[in-house]
Amino acid sequence: RSSAASDVYKRQMLMGVKVLDHIAESRDLPSGIDQRSPARHPDWLGPDDLAVKIEQIREATDGRIPVSVKLGACRVTDDVKLAAKAGADIVVVDSMLAGTGASGEALLDHSGIPTVPSIVMAREALRDMGLYGTVSLVASGGIRSGADMAKALALGADACAIGIGALVALNCNRDIPEADFESEVGVSAGQCHHCQTGKCPVGIATQDPELEKRLDPSEGADRVANFLNSMTMEAALLTRSLGKGDVRSLEPEDMVALTIEASAMARIPFVGTNKVFGWD
């Protein structure tokens, strides 16, 4: 197997080095053995199976919690409609701007759909079904600030999911004194993407007791809380600047596009005009 093929293989596995005793016990797996981690769910192949799976989850939880379906932003319109029809309470659309610690560079840079058009397409898909406002829409991918969040809500999302932003607040990819990225994972800080190896230099994506010591959970929690609070305050500030008292009142009419491309993707007027490029 070539090194490239081996790398792809590893990205489809939960490596045995990460399956320590307490992980194995919680997941009912043998310790230290590589486990399949396929890109798709192996027990369903299409929308009918998805509906069955949603109902199984709903029964297992006695209907006490909403069931969400997370989709990679590709065929957004069709996929959102399928998820909603299958009975999802929440649809999460994860765009190509989302970060990941275990994916090939070609996939990161050249697959998927950006966040802005994915929100708009998902919104219109739910609206076509008469389910906009009934099925919740969560935007994910590239949400790094309160401004990003406010724009996503204005475009039609009910909420935003945060991933990499919170990890960075935890110290992900940061050149901390205890870590030597070059010698430990062979890359410089900021270019890590070695989550799947279990060798996280900052102690986040690892089960190695020595590496785990590099992350202070209490300090990390404080940094994440500060990050989320700052995002919330920034979104609230922008909302108030529009004369509104609730972020749920944000709407597309609150925005204009600064580029022709943004106008076409967001379906909002180009600044200084009433023209929505690509849709008029």
Regions found by a protein language model. Name each.
Residues 4-5, 88, 157, 262:
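Long alpha-helical scaffolds
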Residues 19-27:
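ATP-dependent carboxylate/acyl-activation modules
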Residues 31-35:
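Short glycine/proline-rich turn/loop motifs
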Residues 208-280:
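C-terminal extensions of enzymes
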Residues 11-14:
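Short, glycine/charged-enriched hinge/interface segments at domain edges or termini
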Residues 36-212:
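Glycine-rich phosphate/ribose-binding loops and adjacent secondary-structure elements
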Residues 27-30, 97:
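Active-site-adjacent bridging/hinge elements
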Residues 1-5, 9:
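Single conserved hydrophobic/aromatic residue that forms the stacking wall/gate
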